[in-house]
Amino acid sequence: AQVARGELPTPDPDDEAAKYELADALLGEAGYAWYEISNFARATDVDLASGRPSTFYEHASAHNLAYWRDWDWLGLGPGAHSHVGRMRWWNVKNPAAYAARLRDGRSAAYAGEILDEDTRELERVMLGVRTSEGIELAGLPGTRQTGEAGALLDAGVASGGRVAALIADGLIDGAAALRGRAILTLRGRLLADYVTRELMGY
């Protein structure tokens, strides 16, 4: 908000990237691993090959994971957002107005929307690709339904060509792609919006 109002300069993207890489390294050394681009949790296991943290979901925020996995949730309180199926809504922000609506037996919802299938698919990819679990490559626009994960890397398949390019650019993990999942590399985390657009074929 302060940047939009001109009170602070726009952050330099290269400086932000360098700080993120430093934070990732320091947190890794301290036993934390990323489970979503902006969220880290203490690991309970260490990958012997890399010496880096590996298993950590028991320490991750269940609330955050529900959001990034595109699960349903109910938000309670002034200004809270909710998401159930294709419906999304948000409550009035003013605490007095919120309390008055509840007292009068009225809905606290201020506004909402029903998401179409294209929007739901975009959000599923956009949110899922931000997690260390990544997303399944099968079912992305341009992929063929096959039991052979490696076939997704076939340059003749629309999405496969994009996936191969993302691997070549160091943005998604090649080994994970061979197992049928798009998982961001450290570089990919810095360019997650670009990766999402490429996976969606935009």
Model regions and ranges:
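C-terminal scaffold of the Radical SAM
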Residues: 1-153
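Generic leucine side-chain signal with a strong bias for well-ordered alpha-helical environments
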Residues: 27, 127, 171, 184, ...
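Short active-site-adjacent structural elements
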Residues: 137, 174, 191-192
